[in-house]
Amino acid sequence: MNPLISAASVIAAGLAVGLASIGPGVGQGTAAGQAVEGIARQPEAEGKIRGTLLLSLAFMEALTIYGLVVALALLFANPFV
């Protein structure tokens, strides 16, 4: 195995996980903040807001998991070797 390809794969895997988690992390923080603000304004809508928030958080977290899958593929099933 070429050490240059191995090093590039490790760096690419780290970047894949790191960059794939930035967007969803910011989005989840913003969504949670807005949900808390919405519940504070309208406490009677708490159930509907919470359900929508949890569903949207799951979709955002899926993007991070896709980045993790790409990183694991680069580390353990490297297509460049």
From Swiss-Prot:
Membrane topology category: Multi-pass membrane protein
CDD domains: ATP-synt_Fo_c_ATPH
Domain of life: Eukaryota
Disulphide bridges: none
Keywords in alphabetical order: ATP synthesis, CF(0), Chloroplast, Hydrogen ion transport, Ion transport, Lipid-binding, Membrane, Plastid, Thylakoid, Transmembrane, Transmembrane helix, Transport
Biological processes, Gene Ontology terms: proton motive force-driven ATP synthesis
Site (Reversibly protonated during proton transport): E61
MF (Gene Ontology): lipid binding; proton-transporting ATP synthase activity, rotational mechanism
Transmembrane stretches, start-end: 3-23, 57-77
Pfam family, one: ATP-synt_C
InterPro entries, per the entry: ATP_synth_csu_bac/chlpt, ATP_synth_F0_csu, ATP_synth_F0_csu_DDCD_BS, ATP_synth_F0_csu_sf, ATPase_proteolipid_c-like_dom, F/V-ATP_Csub_sf
Record note on quaternary structure: F-type ATPases have 2 components, F(1) - the catalytic core - and F(0) - the membrane proton channel. F(1) has five subunits: alpha(3), beta(3), gamma(1), delta(1), epsilon(1). F(0) has four main subunits: a(1), b(1), b'(1) and c(10-14). The alpha and beta chains form an alternating ring which encloses part of the gamma chain. F(1) is attached to F(0) by a central stalk formed by the gamma and epsilon chains, while a peripheral stalk is formed by the delta, b and b' chains.
Protein name: ATP synthase subunit c, chloroplastic
Organism of this sequence: Populus trichocarpa (Western balsam poplar)
